[in-house]
Amino acid sequence: MEQPSGRKLAITNLMMLSVAMLWGVAWPVGRILAVDLVDYPFSVMFLRYSFALPVLFVWMWYREGNTIPKQEDWKPLFLMAFTSVFLYQVGYMFGMQRTAASDASLVIGFNPVFVAILSIWLLSHRMNSGGIIGICLSFTGILLIFLASPNVQIPFEERIAGNSLIMFGAFVYAIYVISMRGYILERGEDQLSSLSLIAWVSLIGCIFFIPFVINEAPWDRVWINEEWLLIAYLGVLSTAVAYVFFAIGVDVIGANRASSFVNVVPVFGILSSWFLLDEELGWIQLVSFVLIYFGVRMVNAQPPEGMKNPK
């Protein structure tokens, strides 16, 4: 990779920091919408991607032209859409109805650990002792926020249920990551680009919501401007713009360095939840973050993965 200039590197780092901020603030925004629109969760999910899709497809057409998936692409695209869009959003929205946004921003950090665990069976990924220790550290951090969250204004049983749904979201997103890696390794140079992939996956995933939206009949409700603004934030900024910035960051500074910015998302999630929702700040969150952060770093310091040979 060609070394970027100092100015380009500074701009890219600023973009990546803004990605972490956009994703972090999405947690309290999601909490506000989930609680205020408790009878319309699928409508919120659908509208979020309805806002994101024009941005993603316009950017795709600008960068790559009119990219249409080939026949052999559709099956993996449907699997990726069902897991990363439909099931993940179900875990996200229903989880945010029940738990604190700051807690959820920490719990979702277990996703890379789920990826590593699934890779043992689905990809030829060997787990060394450091990875096992990392899993234990991350799990301890998650357990700590499950059992000792300072957000006691939410009943304990509700927080447990909500955090469990967020964990479900982290798990199904890990399935998406594994299926995407399998698709990339199997298709080689004949694969869709990452930009085309996320655009088409988002479109297919959005379609999955339609039957549930019809059942909710959101057109019978008067939607206020604040709700539209918050949904637009999730769709345009947190989903579409953040992804585009992240993809640019990967191109400039590489995947490993770009991914390191994701580790600070909980910091923005906790602080923005405190500022916007008046959620509690406590040392438990700091300890949980440190355990998850270093646990994930140890898990990610594993040998490269590859596809298993067919038996």
Residue ranges of each PLM-predicted region?
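Alpha-helical transmembrane segments of compact multi-pass small-molecule transporters, enriched
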Residues: 26, 51-55, 107-121, 136, ...
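Hydrophobic transmembrane alpha-helices of multi-pass small-molecule transport proteins
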Residues: 56, 78, 127-149, 263, ...
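Transmembrane alpha-helices of multi-pass small-molecule transport proteins
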Residues: 37-87, 114, 171-179, 198-217, ...
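Hydrophobic/aromatic residues within transmembrane alpha-helices
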Residues: 33, 44, 48, 95, ...
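Juxtamembrane helix-entry segments on the extracytoplasmic side of multipass membrane proteins
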Residues: 8-12, 37-42, 46, 69-75, ...
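Specific transmembrane alpha-helical segments of multi-pass solute transporters/efflux pumps
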Residues: 26-27, 57-108, 144, 235-253
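Glycine-/small-residue-enriched transmembrane alpha-helix faces in small-molecule transporters
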Residues: 1-46, 152-185, 207, 272, ...
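Helix-helix packing/entry segments at the starts of transmembrane helices
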Residues: 19, 44-47, 85, 89, ...
